[in-house]
Amino acid sequence: LFRSGQASTPLAYLIGKTHPDVSYIEVVSSIASKSAGPATRLNIDEYVETTANAASFFSGCTNTKAILILNPAIPCVNMQTTVFATVGQNNMKELKVLVDEIVAKIQVYVPKYQLIVPPTMEDNRIIMTVQVQGLGDYMPSYAGNLDIINCAAIVTAEEYAKKNLKSA
């Protein structure tokens, strides 16, 4: 079962699945500056490269770009990710259905993963935006960028343990 600690990867995958002629994907994420600790700040270049590579790998598009914005606003903003894609043919009907399905699946392990701008076509460009809030249990609710990683790791570890307990 596919589990992603990245908000954009499932969306890029679905764009590639429904639009095999995708020629460009851009991922723009904005996170609260306070949710980016020293380790995050030291690894921004790695995050940007990994995000662009994941968009490419899962969509099949070789021309990808990722941008990360550390927003210093007070009160802190929730994590938000917008995916832009340039496509040839329009297959928005199937994309919208699949995006709704994947959002529901992600919400099982990341309850506050929300589609706030559904897939929209403008000329030959697809735009969609998700917002991720944390549960606010251990970290502030604006730290959705940290919660999505933790939630994906927890559910993956739980599934791994269940599988290994059954085979033992």
Show which residues each predicted segment covers.
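N-terminal leader/assembly segments
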Residues: 1-3, 167-168
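Active-site-lining helix/loop region of Rossmann-like oxidoreductase modules
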Residues: 2-122, 136, 140-143
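NAD(P)-dependent Rossmann-like dehydrogenase/reductase catalytic/cofactor-binding core
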Residues: 120-168
